[in-house]
Amino acid sequence: MALTMLLLLVAAALTLIETRAGPHSLRYFHTAVSWPGLVEPRFIIVGYVDDTQFVRFDSDAENPRMEPRARWMEQEGPEYWERETQKAKGHEESFRVSLRTAQRYYNQSKGGSHTLQWMYGCDVGSDERLLRGYLQFAYEGRDYIALNEDLKTWTAADMAAQITLHKWEQAGIAERDRAYLEGACVQSLRRYLQLRKETLLCTDPPKAHVTHHPRSYGAVTLRCWALGFYPADITLTWQLNGEELTQDMELVETRPAGDGTFQKWASVVVPLGKEQNYTCHVNHEGLPEPLTLRWEPPPSTVSNMANVAILVVLVAWPSLELWWIL
């Protein structure tokens, strides 16, 4: 059992996903947390296909439901989400009971902060057949009990976990878990991979615009935004009178928007009043042709630009700095 699951550390979860064997994986991470003053423990589920979070449940949400976190999961109908929500709420209740049980096993008071975590899933090969299944529990961030690789026996981390091990052996829990991991887990992963494959055939073009951000000393930042595009591969460049400004451009990494699409921006610092000499160029496979954009000042700004330029020259330097901060 080489698992040290820390509360809601998604980066660690992704590291586990990327280093495990198998071309494709389905994993679920369940976490219940109690702390003083909390009426009921907070319960969170996140599900991953490979390195992509595709579902999430949070008991602290206004209307707790299993929700899609990947665009391709939006193809699932209301029946699927209702079924998954009911399963999540069932797991939530089981976790509350198990959290109290673990506190009793370790002779802990009810008033402290406690964490119970559960990770399970399956890996399939390129032929979509099972490579391995796994199921592990952690309590207070430390290993508690895990299903062994044979999917038939358990390893308990300490004496308290031995109590659980004996209970589960008598109840035949390993056989039930093995049936799920070898059956429904693999079938679900195959379905999700198919949904993702169908979505990969679609593209969403970026929605692009340029924003204007004043700086000190008579300069401004022009930032070119590309939002809501899919897939993630995109090119943003700035040009001055037709020449690329690669060296003078700040470019951020492409980031997920949280709805299955992506966003990115690129910026340059330019002299005040010279903004129209700069163009942003956006290239993405969802576009029929690359976009070329300039900053478009509001009508009121255009009419007053000469007055603003004169004012900037006349004001004292401390006032200019204050105007920039505001």
UniProtKB/Swiss-Prot annotation:
Entry keyword Nucleotide-binding: no
SMART domains, per database record: IGc1 (SM00407)
Residue intervals of the Ig-like C1-type domain: 206-294
Residues passing through the membrane, by range: 306-326
Membrane topology listed for this record: Single-pass type I membrane protein
Highest taxon listed in the record's lineage: Eukaryota
Signal peptide extent: 1-21
Disulphides: 122-185, 224-280
Annotated stretches, region: Alpha-1: 22-111
GO terms under biological process: antigen processing and presentation of peptide antigen via MHC class I
Extracellular side: 22-305
Keyword field: Disulfide bond, Glycoprotein, Immunity, Membrane, MHC I, Signal, Transmembrane, Transmembrane helix
Chief location category: membrane
Cellular compartments annotated: Membrane
Keyword presence, Disulfide bond: yes
PANTHER family named in the record: HLA CLASS I HISTOCOMPATIBILITY ANTIGEN, C ALPHA CHAIN, MHC CLASS I-RELATED
Quaternary context: Heterodimer of an alpha chain and a beta chain (beta-2-microglobulin).
Protein name per the record: H-2 class I histocompatibility antigen, Q8 alpha chain
